[in-house]
C-alpha cells in the first residue's frame, strides 16, 4: 500500500517534466524518496521527492546552482532536467504523509556505489585505487568551490562550529539520544564543547572553508571504470574542506585496511589540491565530529539503521571521545602506498 502511494506520487511528480515514463521503480526511502525512471526512448533518470521541510525551495535551487557550476567545470555530477516551463523543481502531494514536497529530476548516472566495492575482503590495491580517486574528486570539488562566487540568492546552511558542535547543531542534539547513559552523555557534552572551541580557533579562511558536498561518503560516489560521479547533493553546505574529506573516510574507519585507505585518500587529495599540515592535523578531529553528528542524524531517522547498528555506532564514537579526552586521537599508520596513476 505504501509503495503504491509513493509510485502514484512519482507519476504525479513526473507530469511537469519533458519525459514520457514507461517504467518507474522505487529505489530508496531515506533522506529523499528516490525512483529510477525509464522513458519510451530507453533513457534513464533519477527522480527525487525531497524530504518535506528539510530545505526551502530557495535552498534547493541553490543546490542546483552549484551542481550546474560543477558540470560546467567538467566535474562528473548528475545532469539536472528542468520542467517543461523551465523550473528546477515541481511540487507534488504525498498523501501518505499528508504533505507536499518538491520533486527534482536528473539523468541517470552510470556506475556502482563505491560502498559496494570496498569491504574487508577487497584487495588492498583496489581500496587504495578507489580512495585515491575519491580524495582527488573531493579536492577537485573543493578547488571549484574555493574559486566560485555564488550569486546573492544562494542560500544554504552552515556546518561551522555552531552547525556541527553548537548547542543546537544542524543534525540535532546528539547527546540527548534516549539510549545514551548519563556518563556517556557527560562525555559527549564535554567533547562537543572542546571541539566547538577547536573549530572556532581553526577559523574560516577561504583556503579551507567554502561550499562543500558534506556527504560524499562511499554510498554517494559512483564508480564507472576510471570515472567517479558525485551524487546526492541534498546536504551541501558552507563548511570546511577537511570535514568534506573526513566524510569520505568516516564509514571505512573500522575496515582492517583503514590505514591504507586513509593514506590513499589523502594522497589523492594532495595530488590535486595543496593542503597545509595544519589542515591535515584537523582530520582526526573532523572524523570524530562526523561520528558525533551522525548520532544525531540517525536519532531523527531511526528507520535507516537497526538498533544494533545504532548501538555499535554510538559505542564507536564514545571510544573516540575517550581517545580525544586522553589526547591520543590520531589516524592509523599505513604501509607505504602503492603508487597509482592519477585518474583525475
Annotate the PLM regions:
Residues 121-183:
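A cross-family kinase active-site recognition segment
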Residues 52, 86, 99, 105-121, ...:
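A glycine-centered beta->alpha junction motif in the catalytic cores
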Residues 1-88, 225, 337-344:
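Conserved NTP-binding catalytic cores of kinases and kinase-like/nucleotidyltransferase enzymes
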Residues 30-42, 46-47, 80, 196-242, ...:
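Active-site acidic catalytic loop and adjacent metal/ATP-binding pocket
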Residues 174, 294-344:
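ATP/Mg2+ or Mg2+-diphosphate-binding catalytic cores
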Residues 241-274, 288-305:
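Active-site activation/catalytic loop segments of kinase-like enzymes and analogous catalytic loops
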Residues 40-149:
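ATP-binding pocket architecture of kinase catalytic cores
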Residues 5-13, 146-150, 165-213, 340-341:
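An alpha-helical support segment within catalytic cores of ATP-dependent transferases
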